Swiss-Prot record:
Physiological role: Plays a critical role for male fertility and sperm motility by regulating sperm cytoplasm removal and maintaining axoneme integrity.
Name the record gives this protein: Transmembrane protein 232
Record organism: Homo sapiens (Human)
Coiled-coil region list: none
BP term (GO), one: maintenance of protein complex location
């Protein structure tokens, strides 16, 4: 896919990974990925710098086919190490090594690059949170930032690879932010410092990506997460100036590394926990959650995004949570639009960041529409609670003289509301929300093809998209359709293949299916640790040799940072102590698995010895039986023929001289 964009100047425009830091990583990771000692030879299919250069530069068709075959073998090996079919679990899975290998393989152009990035995105989506993943996550983060800042900046057009890199970067920094909340980034300051030049360059990408919210939203999330982490972990070393949310950090204990979460995020995690545990306190929690809905208007919108992600996961299982989610966002959009409509500019809060929250909400709605537990939840996310015929009949509000009132924030209601306010100079929240809805509807329609049970839902989405395509003249919204089609790598028109069954791309993940649940589960353990967790020993996680990223650097002591989550109205849960991840029981399970495996191997050896003894005894008995049988035959022969010679044996003759 290529679309014209205006690229901004970036730093370090040399091609490939060529810095001394990456040169060292080549050597270190190749030794680790091959799994061989120094005296053993590397397998023929290991990734090398020469292999990547030959793959991209060769003109010989025969050699190109051989290299492609080798790359496909590596792809198969990586799929197994990533555990794509087992959600990243199993004895054969080693995520840090696989992530590093896949990000190297993604430098091979063509189908190998696309499949590698698809695999990496799927793995980062469903993998669990493990402290041992951090070195590999930082390496993937630096590689993605390098590609976005250097390789992408040299291109005149927008490529589908940029979209995939931005999505991967979003997942990586989302994971890093969760580790930051656990206090696990204190010993990774050098890793954070290495990201600063690339983050600085990425901060100038607004001119390149502002027309494409699906990319720009991911970029803004990366920058915001890095800014917050940098303020807390790097202090003066960060390239970001602490100009925002100074009061947010003044009321926390800087010596203890405190980070104040807002009430909305806390209650969203509590609501998710209630849904998971089928708690009768859910309604009370949701009442308090709606009471704190104004916290969604806080300038530190990263907490708001996390809150919506967690509440969206609860909404996939519970209708009351879905209603609370829609009510909170409805109030947020109404408040933002009322502020933007005020003519008085004095002392009006700056909501230039609000479009990020609105766009991510459209993604959450799309995921609910696809992956909710019941058909009622999926239908409600699309149509809403009113079930009005007008909402189904007038999908696009063509008469803009009387703008409709925003009664709820389902997909069709928001589509009607934003389309009525579209203009060339409309607010960014309006056209970004409209863009996100159309962009995600195309992907939903593509995802639902072939699913007969969802035909009614897909028919309504198809009609909506058809009207948008026919009547919407705004170039930005037309771009949403074109980019979504190109991202799906689908050369055909989705509006002309309604009755055609077409298989989806192998390994292509349209939406992130599991990361929201992983985050909700992790934050629930962080905010509401079980009572027995307070008696767990505070151990330092060990750092393995094969996960040491820098051989010339001394290992720093992994001193865990204790965060204090300040929730003023809940003193009982303030200052919750953090414990290293993974916890005691996870480690105990791993040790138990090792013990079981050890005893199983010993039992296999004993069985092999017993089998060998049995086979030897059987062979001995067989030979003895043959010997006895032969002696019996000779005895009968002697009795009948009075001969002692063996059958067919001539008697001995003395030669007469």
């Amino acid at each position: 896919m290529n679309m014209p964009v205006n690229k901004s100047p970036m730093i370090n425009t040399c091609g490939g990974i060529s810095s001394p830091y990456h040169e060292e990583l080549w050597k270190l990771n190749f030794q680790h990925l091959s799994g061989e000692r120094g005296h053993k030879s590397r397998p023929t299919f290991s990734i090398t710098k020469e292999f990547i250069l030959r793959f991209n530069q060769t003109q010989n068709s025969k050699e190109k086919e051989e290299l492609l075959e080798l790359a496909r073998k590596i792809i198969l090996r990586c799929k197994r190490k990533l555990g794509l079919k087992t959600l990243g679990s199993g004895r054969h899975v080693h995520l840090p090594a696989a992530w590093t290998e896949v990000i190297y393989l993604a430098q091979c152009k063509g189908e190998i690059q696309d499949e590698s990035l698809n695999m990496l995105y799927a793995s980062l989506d469903h993998a669990s949170f493990d402290y041992d993943h951090l070195p590999a996550l930082f390496f993937v983060a630096e590689s993605v930032l390098y590609r976005l800042c250097c390789d992408a900046s040299l291109k005149t057009y927008l490529y589908s690879v940029e979209i995939k890199l931005a999505k991967i970067g979003y997942l990586v920094f989302l994971r890093l932010f969760i580790f930051f909340l656990h206090g696990h980034l204190e010993s990774f300051k050098q890793h954070l410092l290495r990201l600063q030049p690339y983050l600085y360059a990425l901060s100038f990408s607004g001119a390149s990506y502002h027309k494409y919210p699906n990319i720009f939203s991911n970029v803004q999330f990366i920058l915001k997460a890095s800014e917050i982490i940098g303020k807390r972990e790097l202090r003066s070393e960060s390239i970001f100036r602490p100009v925002e949310d100074k009061k947010r950090y003044e009321n926390t204990d800087s010596d203890m590394g405190g980070y104040e979460i807002n009430h909305l995020l806390w209650h969203c995690v509590a609501a998710w926990s209630c849904v998971q545990n089928n708690s009768p306190q859910l309604n009370n929690v949701l009442e308090h959650l709606v009471f704190h809905k104004t916290q969604l208007q806080k300038k530190c919108w990263l907490d708001s995004v996390l809150a919506l992600l967690v509440l969206g996961e609860a909404a996939k299982l519970n209708m009351a949570c879905l209603k609370a989610l829609m009510d909170v966002v409805r109030d947020f959009v109404s408040s933002i639009m009322s502020v933007q409509n005020q003519e008085e500019s004095c002392k009006v809060d700056d909501f230039s960041w609000a479009w990020n929250v609105v766009y991510i909400y459209t993604v959450i709605l799309a995921e609910i529409c696809l992956y909710a537990a019941t058909s009622d939840l999926r239908k409600t996310a699309l149509i809403g609670f009113c079930h009005c015929k007008s909402s189904q009949k007038n999908i696009l509000y063509l008469d803009k003289s009387v703008p409709p009132e925003l009664k709820e924030t389902s997909i069709l209601s928001l589509l009607e509301y934003f389309s009525s306010k579209m203009s060339e100079n409309c607010d960014q929240v309006v056209w970004t929300g409209y863009y996100g809805l159309v962009y995600n509807l195309v992907k939903i329609s593509w995802e639902l093809q072939g699913d007969e049970e969802q035909d009614g839902l897909r028919n309504m989405i198809w009609q909506t998209l058809q009207k948008t395509k026919d009547y919407e003249e705004d170039v930005r919204i037309q771009n949403a359709i074109n980019i979504a089609q190109a991202e799906l790598n689908d050369p055909t028109d989705p509006f002309t293949r309604y009755s055609t069954n077409i298989s989806s791309n192998v390994g292509e993940e349209v939406f992130s299916k599991y990361i929201g649940w992983r985050i909700a589960n992790t934050l629930s353990k962080l905010f509401f640790p079980p009572i027995e967790a307070h008696f767990l020993p505070l151990k330092k996680p060990s750092i393995k040799k094969d996960q040491t990223k820098y051989p010339n650097k001394k290992l720093e002591s992994v001193k865990k940072q204790v965060l204090h989550f300040t929730v003023r109205e809940h003193p009982s849960v303030s200052e919750i102590p953090m414990f290293p991840y993974p916890d005691f029981f996870t480690k105990a399970d791993k040790e138990l698995a090792k013990i079981i495996d050890h005893h199983w191997q010993e039992e296999l050896k004993i069985r092999e010895k017993e089998d060998a003894i049995c086979k030897a005894q059987e062979l001995k008995d067989k030979k003895l039986a043959e010997k006895n049988h032969f002696q019996e035959v000779m005895k009968k022969r002697e009795e009948k023929l009075h001969k002692q010679t063996k059958p067919y044996e001539l008697p001995y003759r003395k030669e007469v001289i």
